[in-house]
Amino acid sequence: MRTMWWPCLVLALLSGLETSGFPRSPLQLLGKRSLPEGVVDGIEVYSTKISCKVTSRFAHNVVTTRAVNRADTAKEVSFDVELPKTAFITNFTLTIDGVTYPGNVKEKEVAQKQYEKAVSQGKTAGLVKASGRKLEKFTVSVNVAAGSKVTFELTYEELLKRNKGKYEMYLKVQPKQLVRHFEIDAHIFEPQGISMLDAEASFITNDLLGSALTKSFSGKKGHVSFKPSLDQQRSCPTCTDSLLNGDFTIVYDVNRESPGNVQIVNGYFVHFFAPQGLPVVPKNIVFVIDVSGSMSGRKIQQTREALLKILDDVKEDDYLNFILFSTDVTTWKDHLVQATPANLKEAKTFVKNIHDQSMTNINDGLLKGIEMLNKAREDHTVPERSTSIIIMLTDGDANTGESRPEKIQENVRNAIGGKFPLYNLGFGNNLNYNFLETLALENHGLARRIYEDSDANLQLQGFYEEVANPLLTNVEVEYPENAILDLTRNSYPHFYDGSEIVVAGRLVDRNMDNFKADVKGHGALNDLTFTEEVDMEEMDAALKEQGYIFGDYIERLWAYLTIEQLLEKRKNAKGDEKENITAEALDLSLKYHFVTPLTSMVVTKPEDNEDQTSIADKPGEEAIAETTTMSFLTTQQSSQSPYYYVDGDPHFIIQIPGKNDSICFNIDEKPGTVLRLIQDPVTGITVTGQIIGDKRSNASSRTGKTYFGKLGITNAWMDFRVEVTTEKIILGTGAELSTFSWLDTITVTQTGLSVTINRKKNMVVSFGDGISFVIILHQVWKKHPVHQDFLGFYVVDSHRMSAQTHGLLGQFFQPFDFKVFGIRPGSDPTKPDATMVVKNHRLTVTRGSQKDYRKDASVGTKVICWFVHNNGEGLIDGVHTDYIVPSLF
């Protein structure tokens, strides 16, 4: 699948603390050699953690910073975080010496009095303000007594929007001092499956710091971790200042087996729509460019550079023109022309000669462009199946001709008549951005600020690339009549390649059996309808595992999207309509605890024995041996080194220091099913196993004993694989295959790999020093009426496998804990029941036994274990069917 890289919705963070007497810029705490390491003016920031959890594009982010005042006097400590302008703060808590002071979201007018009182008394109040292009800065401070500890925790949520084929989270990291425990931990869960995941940091300039960054994805789950030690943070081996200063970016995309994807949880649904492979709809585009005097110098030069680059990307099926406005209006051509090579060459000559002139006549420039597009359509000089777009770039306010904003809005609205979108690009800060935004929103477009930086030309090019490839026009998303409530926006003038349409709503009947969604649109060749049908029972089963992120995510996603769209509509509303929209958005903001332009978060904390109020305020609008099913066993015994295996009917055993007990469970699946046992994206190692039954079993039966009859081991980085059956072993390196039988005794080696076959007993597969597997052959009498040969799989060394290792066996490679209590008689007097707490689940378990065949393949060693019922539910991550794969390789 094609993955396009593009700046997207930004998640930014700046976390830190500063003391009184230091500049109030974020985290400007410089290390001093005369002080203990990590302590600045008596304040030690000993922990900063950014925890990001994303489920179906909806991000839940928690920023936690902990500090201690090691001075002998009280100190003021400040907490600064930069977060995306598109995010809503949902919680802020302040904990001092174990006492937590929570935040409460209130209507802005109610909170304002508390805010003004705090400021008038000279107290520091928390606030949120704009910071850079895509960020807002949250700041709050508090006095901390000598020897006291303080914890700041900020939570915010946002919907990641897809641009140019990817979702992006961008974190601004600037502690500017060494932090004993600094960690970024991001977990991503996408039911469609993750197709790519990457992470990078601008400040990682050496291998030592780079080794602190790990990233992996498998199936539906992705993980990024950045956890540098103190030494890895240092700018030099003996320095006390930090390298952590710059941008940390995570990007990912999802699999798209169909154009749409619908997810339903607890009566709320979200519908993602992003078709691929459609032909591009030809576009008719007019660029309306401000060439007034204020555009002189660098601005006009960057505009020329951007337009020349855009002309390189215009497709030959497109039609275009340029309109320049200052006091007067001039055009390149009298009408739209096709983007032939000759016309593009002429257009570049025109662009190179653009220069600044005098005043700013926005009204006439826009009306001329609109007239040109309307006439081209009326005269049929552009393709019937094409779409029109107008893009205006200006750096100031109208000051000649019609200069009243309301009148310009009326003129443009009447001229366009809803037929095509207007996109406004505001260059710099000396302009009425609210006017440009309103003008665009009224005409199905959007506004974007172009910042006066060295990359302004790239910003202009970037915006054009967003709208360069329309795949559908007049998109309508439809659902069964009377089946839904509270639907978010479901009509869009365009769908652009690399983007995504998101619609959410509420079901009238939560017990409905199926759900259908239709998306209709005009394509380049014909009208298209995309239908997505959902079986509710299958949906419930597929989404069970999502609770490990946060269970009500679809409802919160719906609320977020609804509020966001209401606030956008509010900008153009008037009178009663505006009041009604405001009331609805306010109610939702309060209900779901979102800090929006209509609400504020109030935190009351102690300050010199008085209450102090802080405000988080968002800127405004700008039996187990006899079982007949597959059994899995985990064992923990403190006296031995960790080992892991699956054997018998098959038993999974995991041994971890610190416990002297075992856990086991069964998987009830039919013969022929292939299960993923181990998958490590870092080492590239994957192990799978195919189930066989006894001789009475058939492919559709889940009764009778089951075993592993075939195993597959691959190492993607070495281009190596081995297929093991009860009859033969096939080794493959690249395109070369070698076949051996269990009658052989042989060792095969190459760099980083060793395979040893011990005749009729076992084989050992080792990947260097630190990863070693043993496969045991179990043979029975060939004429036995029921039993047949099977395999056992043992991990005898796994210490070089990464923390991202997963699978039915691999997920237990990392330490975990469980507690057993409440032992009581069970239904079988010889097998008591008990309550087990493991992985935040409370389970009923039963005492039983399994076998360890490492020392004696015929008899085995008895292992006592606690049996987890229902296919290991609550013990394994997700459900057992998540580990079923189509084939061995």
UniProtKB/Swiss-Prot annotation:
Cross-referenced PROSITE patterns: VIT, VWFA
Residues bearing carbohydrate: N91, N580
GO MF annotation list: serine-type endopeptidase inhibitor activity
Keywords: Cleavage on pair of basic residues, Glycoprotein, Protease inhibitor, Proteoglycan, Secreted, Serine protease inhibitor, Signal
GO biological process: hyaluronan metabolic process
Post-translational changes noted in the entry: Heavy chains are linked to bikunin via chondroitin 4-sulfate esterified to the alpha-carboxyl of the C-terminal aspartate after propeptide cleavage.
Highest taxon in the source lineage: Eukaryota
Propeptide cleavage-removed residue intervals: 22-33, 650-889
N-terminal signal peptide: 1-21
Subcellular location: Secreted
SUPFAM superfamilies (alphabetical): vWA-like (SSF53300)
Residue span, VWFA domain: 284-467
Keyword Signal set for record: yes
Subunit field text: I-alpha-I plasma protease inhibitors are assembled from one or two heavy chains (HC) and one light chain, bikunin. Pre-alpha-inhibitor (P-alpha-I) is composed of ITIH3/HC3 and bikunin.
Full protein name: Inter-alpha-trypsin inhibitor heavy chain H3
Organism encoding this protein: Mus musculus
Gene name of this polypeptide: Itih3
